[in-house]
Each structure stands twice: as C-alpha cells, then as structure tokens.
Amino acid sequence: ADLHNHFVLGGSREYIFNKTGYKIKSITTPLKSMGEMDSWSSKYIGNHFNSPEGRKLLIEATFAQAKFDGVTVLEIGEDVWGLGEFFDNDIEKIILCFQEANARIAPEIELRLQIGLSRHCSVDYLMNCLSHFWGHKEFYSIDLYGDELAQSIANFIPIYDKAAENGLVLKAHVGEWGTAKDIITAVELLHLNEVQHGIAAVQDENVIEYLIENNIRLNITPSSNVLLGRVSDMAHHPIAQLYHRGVDVTIGSDDVLIFNSDISKEYLRLYQSGCLTKEELDDIRING
C-alpha cells in the first residue's frame, strides 16, 4: 500500500517523458527548507502541467508508477482548490478522472480517494470548497498538509468535525517539522485516525505510548525525511525505533518526482542501510 502520496508529484517520470518528452530531475542532496522544495517544484513542475489535461496526465503517471511498484492500495486525491482550477467546480469530473485512470492503467489497484487541504488557506475558503465534496461516498479520507506552522491546528476543528460526520478517515501532516507534542494535540483536537509523517514522536516516550494506546497509524516517508533534512540518514531513520516499540507504521512515497522515492526503492533503502530487516519490512508491508 502507498497511503502517503501526493499525486501531483507522485508519478512515473518515465511515463511523463514518454507522453511529453519532458524530463523531470529528482533532487540528490538534502534541502535546507520547504522553500527550497517549492523552488524545485516551480522549476520542474511549474506551469508545465497547469491545465486540466496536465492534471490528468499527472494522475495517470501516479497510477503508472504505483502499478510498476506493485502497489495494491493507493490513497491519493485532489486538493480542494483544484476543483475550480481544473475541473470547472464539477465534483463528478474529479471523481471520474481518478476512477477512469485507475480502471484504464491499473485496475488491480484499490483506489482510496482523498480530499486534500492546504494548511495555509483560510478555514472559510476551505469550507466553501468542501461544500462540493461533502456527501460523496467515493471519497475515503481527508488530509491536511503544507506548512505545519502556518496556523493553529485548532482552526481546522469545524472541518474535521464535518469530515467525521461524512464518514471520512481523518488524517493530517503533523510531526514532520513540528514537535512530538504537536502530534498529540492534532490527534486530540481533530480526532485523527492516522498521521502523515509523525516522526517527531520518537522524541517523547509519552507520545509513543499515546500512539500505541490509541491505535494511531503513522504513514512515514523515509527518503523525503532524509532529503528534507528531518533525519540525518536512512540508517538512523526513526521508523525503526517506532516500529520496534509497537507503533503502527506504513511506508509511503510522498513525492516520487522530487525524492526519487518509489515505494520499492523506499523498502530497499531501509533494508540496505540496515535500518530494518527484510522480515520487519515484510511485516510493515503486510500490515499496510
């Protein structure tokens, strides 16, 4: 399974090149900030895919990459702002776009359609966008991402209360740039089922115990953590300590086009670095 994948940056560079002749280079040395990551995105993604057709191509490329890696469950979805930008505020267009690419390119993959929220956006704006999404059972989960320091996580309580009413799995990016305590705060305020990243939990034994007792899953992306400077190297990635303590963890790709982080490579890197054994990695794979 790949339960942490941002489809805009999650696709196969080979698929994109074959369709467009455009080469996208991944980064090879750690970045110093999210700003540097945004600069990379502007350079290599920018306006190249800033159209309905470009968006559809990126969706197709993500299914192509997942198929190549043998992924069986893929959780991806559009950011709410994309509904008006690329799909004429027609929610059925978004749903059908993902479903059609799924059926045509990788019908063997279970698609879990996700609603994406950018943390820097105002809650009023997000609620307005979300009015188109509520009530559509095709959506499986909701995820909040972006700058963890952009605004208080408490601001998003009304959104997550509504999402819970709609039966969505509740997720958010926390504990990548923030603290271990931020993870508990987010889980308690938003009633999260899963946390994207959450690696800061390793800093606090009480937080680790909390995650275990409350069955909170962490969907962790190792190469992303290393290349964004959140972890010193793969051999010492905190996923090992969290797994050994009994925290529910999965391995995700995050942004394949940036980090060259295909799921198969993530498992291989964790094994080759000595971070986790093949038996431990297989256990994580099956659990995911």
Please annotate each region the language model reported:
Residues A1-L168, W177-K181, L189-E194, A200-R217, ...:
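Metal-cofactor-binding active-site regions of metalloenzymes
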